[in-house]
């Protein structure tokens, strides 16, 4: 097993290009290790990931190339011959939900919460929805995006976003690693390839997601909200 922690402490687990590159590097290393069957994504307790780095987004008015790179990372999760698993102990929002949706298995503690707050900023979870719909079904993913309401762990488990609720995640991880160790990596890859053919996330899906993200990020109302947050720490619902 190879473990990577996504929470960067002071930045509360925001997703930026550096994190995306680091996750790609960890995948490269895990895939190169013939003994490794599991890439485990973890965080510091309290916050798993808050999604897009909004301060960085405020400084980047042009096309969001990072959106395409993030989409490619999620798609790689669904194709690698590794079992990609995540342990959640706390809050997950925005792109963090996308990371989970693209994982093969998600373990979460009872106190965890899961939300898509993008609409509050005038945005949409463009890169997240294709993977979340595949995992939870259309209506649950759509409702999460529309209402922006956080789900508790029990709700997330009921809709398939969480695979196991664990008071003791370490014990659940040991069980997972034990069982994954019995699988041939080629078989995991075959399963992902076949499942991907049954529910395809294509290059056209990627293009649609990135183009829509670029369109929304260029809207004046969105730029104003991001700028206000970056400059004054003011959220849209506080204005």
Question: What is the predicted function of each stretch?
Answer:
Residues 75, 97-98, 130, 142, ...:
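Alpha-helical segments flanking ligand/cofactor-binding loops in enzyme cores
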Residues 75-121, 150:
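Glycine-rich beta-to-alpha active-site loop
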Residues 99-100, 156, 229:
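Key positions in alpha-helical "signaling/recognition" and NTPase switch elements
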Residues 1-44, 178:
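Conserved CoA-thioester-binding segment of acyl-CoA-metabolizing enzymes
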Residues 107-112, 162-208, 237-239:
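C-terminal long alpha-helix characteristic of the crotonase
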Residues 21, 43-76:
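Glycine- (often His-adjacent) and acidic-residue-rich active-site loop
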Residues 129-139:
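Hydrophobic, secondary-structure "cap" segments at the distal end of domains
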Residues 90, 104-105, 143, 147-149, ...:
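Well-ordered beta-strand positions
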């Amino acid at each position: 097993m190879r473990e990577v922690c996504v929470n960067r402490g002071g930045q509360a687990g925001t997703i930026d290009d550096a994190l995306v590159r680091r996750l790609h590097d960890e995948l490269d290393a895990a895939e190169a290790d013939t003994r490794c069957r599991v890439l485990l994504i973890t965080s510091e307790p309290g916050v798993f990931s808050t999604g897009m780095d909004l301060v960085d987004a405020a400084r980047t008015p042009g096309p969001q190339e990072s959106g395409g790179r993030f989409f490619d990372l999620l798609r790689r999760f669904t194709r690698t011959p590794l079992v990609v698993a995540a342990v959640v102990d706390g809050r997950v929002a925005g792109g963090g939900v996308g990371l989970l949706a693209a994982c093969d298995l998600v373990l979460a503690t009872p106190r965890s919460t899961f939300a898509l707050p993008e609409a509050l900023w005038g945005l949409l979870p463009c890169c997240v929805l294709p993977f979340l719909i595949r995992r939870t079904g259309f209506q649950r993913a759509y409702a999460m995006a529309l209402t922006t309401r956080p789900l508790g762990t029990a709700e997330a488990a009921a809709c398939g976003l969480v695979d196991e609720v664990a008071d003791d995640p370490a014990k659940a991880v040991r069980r997972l690693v034990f069982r994954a160790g019995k699988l041939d990596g080629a078989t995991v890859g075959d399963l992902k390839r076949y499942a991907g053919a049954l529910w395809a996330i294509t290059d056209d899906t990627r293009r649609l997601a990135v183009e829509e993200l670029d369109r929304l990020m260029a809207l004046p109302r969105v730029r104003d909200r991001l700028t206000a947050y970056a400059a004054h720490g003011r959220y849209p619902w506080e204005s």
